[in-house]
Amino acid sequence: MERPRLAPRGRAIGVAAAAGLAAAMGVGRFVFTPLLPIMTASTGLGAGDGAVIATGNYAGYLVGALLLTRLPQLSRRGTFLAWSLVLIASEAAMAASAQVAVYTALRFAAGVASAAIFIACASTVSRHRAEGASLGVAFAGVGSGIAVTGLFTLLAGPHLSWQGLWIGSAVLTALLLAPAWLLDIRPEIGTDVTGSRPAPGPRERRAWLLLLGAYFAEGVGYIIVGTFLVAAVAGPDTTAATGPALWLVVGLAAAPATVAWHAVARRFGTGRALVAALTVQAVGVAAPALHDGLVAALISALAFGGTFMGVVVLAIDLGNRLPVARPAATLTTLYAIGQVIGPLLVVPVLGSSFTGAFAIAAMIVAVAAALAAGATRAAAPS
């Protein structure tokens, strides 16, 4: 039987949303990762400073997600344009300062705007799924955006100052957001499913608590890698192109990851796929902690890029299968809190090497895998 094709309108919505997510997440949220070592070399910014600045962005994302959850009317076409301008302006303004406090405030603003854009794009695709809009296509935008930032830094890095790279990132964000401005953004209408689902029994409650713990731990662990992977390979034994090229690998691995892990879930089950993704990520994150070298960093980039978005989709899917209220919102909130904690957690071990930070991240992600395995067993029919 011939597989159904995406309707042209649905396909266009998915692609436009993917461009928006590439701007909001791939550039707006993660461009600091390849730019951090360049700023460190040019301004003397320390690894601890980088952790604080990154935490500002993740805290902003948490605030933005909570804000849009409480006030969904802030997600409309007009406010979407305003959030876009905030994101673009916050990136461009990074070039005009040399103060950690200012950088942190600007990254906080970018985090709030990124969350608003992410929610608007994702909810728009969900609303049009019957027309063929695909969340898999939309979420591929995150990895594509990361790849774009890696390629941009790789090509423009030798020719632009760090200030020029931030301004270029703002221009790149504007270009990627342009298709998303055509989307029909409307407030997401949420429903409390408590009354429509049976009350969870002891096994379901145990599965839910274990899944919450796993997803929180993943938020703490993965973001350590997402913040410091490029900075970790900067040194006398590598060239200026090594870090951006590594970040490009992360993006290329992330782009097809959600579709790939969805296929694994259909074959082996959502819970088993989640455990597998977390296990692969833990092993990959441990590689730079066990061996200083480009091969270990490449393994980490492939494993990290190939799993972190897959974990998001699989964890939320598993949560949606449990008889609990608002699983996606609760999981996303805990994940965002974990991201705020992650960079600050490793500040005491940051120094001339990132080995300690990656070792901590690997152990935390391994704990997430163990908790996810427990959740999968508890959620299985008895």
Language-model-detected regions and their locations in the chain:
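Extracytoplasmic gate region of multi-pass secondary transporters
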Residues: 33, 207-248, 255
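Helix-breaking motifs and short loop linkers at transmembrane-helix boundaries and internal kinks
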Residues: 44, 96-101, 113, 269, ...
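Conserved MFS/SLC helix-loop-helix module at the cytosolic interface between two early adjacent transmembrane helices
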Residues: 62-99
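Helix-to-loop junctions at the C-terminal end of transmembrane segments
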Residues: 64-76, 257-270, 350
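Helix-loop-helix hairpin linking two adjacent transmembrane segments in secondary transporters
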Residues: 100, 131, 136-185
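Cytoplasmic helix-loop-helix junction between adjacent transmembrane helices
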Residues: 106-142
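C-terminal transmembrane helical hairpin of 12-TM major facilitator-type secondary transporters
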Residues: 271-315
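A late C-terminal transmembrane helix in Major Facilitator Superfamily
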Residues: 322-355, 361
